[in-house]
């Protein structure tokens, strides 16, 4: 299954969950798209609930099903902690996500584009792989030639507050993951246990 590239508001309304984190797309129409949207939310089966929760998390990070499933498999090999939380941590450590958390992009999709286009450095070296796994303490910065890209500057200007697990210097356009996040600091609306149940049946 390929990565979804359509409007995020449609997916948000279909899932009843804000994929952008702002909630704006649900403010006026908190129902699925289509003519019968308001009356089209039926009660989900156990499998349906698990699938919906998996889709919420997958679309939030903008991954294809293959990427998402492969990362889950990697999480099963992490020692200590719960499988669901370990999976969430691996999602958070993706370079595109850290760029988004630092406020260098307004969305994860935009952050992925910045990484793909070579605008982002890790410890001074250009990394153009969105799935690159960031370590605590690594310095994420904007390449000198990209420091005046309007979209990056606008994102930094528009960012109000950043998670407690990152640090950021707006003048230098650089920051880092200072520690791994706690569970209540990332996607508290997601029930990752349902995602684990879904994949335990599939794998």
From Swiss-Prot:
Tell me which Pfam families the record gives: Ribosomal_S4, S4
The regions listed as transmembrane in this protein's record are none
Question: Can you tell which superkingdom this protein's organism belongs to?
Answer: Bacteria
What is the species listed in this Swiss-Prot or TrEMBL entry? Answer: Streptococcus thermophilus (strain ATCC BAA-250 / LMG 18311)
- Tell me, what does this protein do in biology? One of the primary rRNA binding proteins, it binds directly to 16S rRNA where it nucleates assembly of the body of the 30S subunit. With S5 and S12 plays an important role in translational accuracy.
Alphabetical list of Gene3D superfamilies matching this protein: Ribosomal Protein S4 Delta 41, Chain A, domain 1, RNA-binding S4 domain
Kindly provide the name given to this protein in its UniProt entry.
Small ribosomal subunit protein uS4
Read off the NCBIfam families from this record.
PRK05327.1, rpsD_bact
Q: Which gene encodes it?
A: rpsD
């Amino acid at each position: 299954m390929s990565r979804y590239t359509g409007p995020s508001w449609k997916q948000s309304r279909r899932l009843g969950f804000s994929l952008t984190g702002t909630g704006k797309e649900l403010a006026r129409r908190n129902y699925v798209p289509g003519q019968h949207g308001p009356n089209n939310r039926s009660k989900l089966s156990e499998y349906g609930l698990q699938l919906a929760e998996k889709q919420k998390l997958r679309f939030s990070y903008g991954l294809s099903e293959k990427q998402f499933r492969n990362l889950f498999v990697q999480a099963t090999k992490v020692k200590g902690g719960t499988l669901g939380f370990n999976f969430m941590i691996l999602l958070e450590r993706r370079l595109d996500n850290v760029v988004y958390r630092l406020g260098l992009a307004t969305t994860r999709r935009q952050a992925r584009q910045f990484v793909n286009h070579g605008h982002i450095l890790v410890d001074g070296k250009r990394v153009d792989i969105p799935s690159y796994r960031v370590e605590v303490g690594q310095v994420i910065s904007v390449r000198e030639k990209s420091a005046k890209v309007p979209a990056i500057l606008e994102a930094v200007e528009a960012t109000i507050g950043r998670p407690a697990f990152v640090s950021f210097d707006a003048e230098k356009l650089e920051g880092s993951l200072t520690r791994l996040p706690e569970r209540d600091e990332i996607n508290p609306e997601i029930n990752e246990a349902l995602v684990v149940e879904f994949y335990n049946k599939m794998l």
